[in-house]
Curated annotation (Swiss-Prot):
Belongs to the universal ribosomal protein uS19 family. GO terms for molecular function: rRNA binding; structural constituent of ribosome. One of its GO terms (cellular component) is mitochondrial small ribosomal subunit. This is Small ribosomal subunit protein uS19c. Protein S19 forms a complex with S13 that binds strongly to the 16S ribosomal RNA. It is found in: Plastid, Chloroplast. It comes from Huperzia lucidula (Shining clubmoss). Gene3D superfamilies: 30s Ribosomal Protein S19, Chain A. Keywords: Chloroplast, Plastid, Ribonucleoprotein, Ribosomal protein, RNA-binding, rRNA-binding. The gene is rps19. The keyword Iron does not apply. GO terms for biological process: ribosomal small subunit assembly; translation. It comes from the Eukaryota. HAMAP family: Ribosomal_uS19. SUPFAM superfamilies: Ribosomal protein S19.
Amino acid sequence: MARSLEKGPFVAYHLLKKIENLNVEEEKKIIVTWSRASTIVPIMVGHTIAVHNGQEHLPIYVTDRMVGHKLGEFAPTRIFRGHAKNDKKSRR
């Protein structure tokens, strides 16, 4: 279900404040956040945001094609190690 257009996108206040401060100072620092639910807005483009995946913070460089997506979409939480190589032995 989509979010109402009246409400606007969700962006954590602390994250928005950090990005605005960096834009004013014209700095490019890595911003560490746990807010995977925050929507990527146009003022984030060009910044590197380290998003927590449950174990570590993964640095993500935000491009213009990412606008409208959530930060958590770019930091996978599960690692697929593949299926069993030889399944015939386990069946017998």
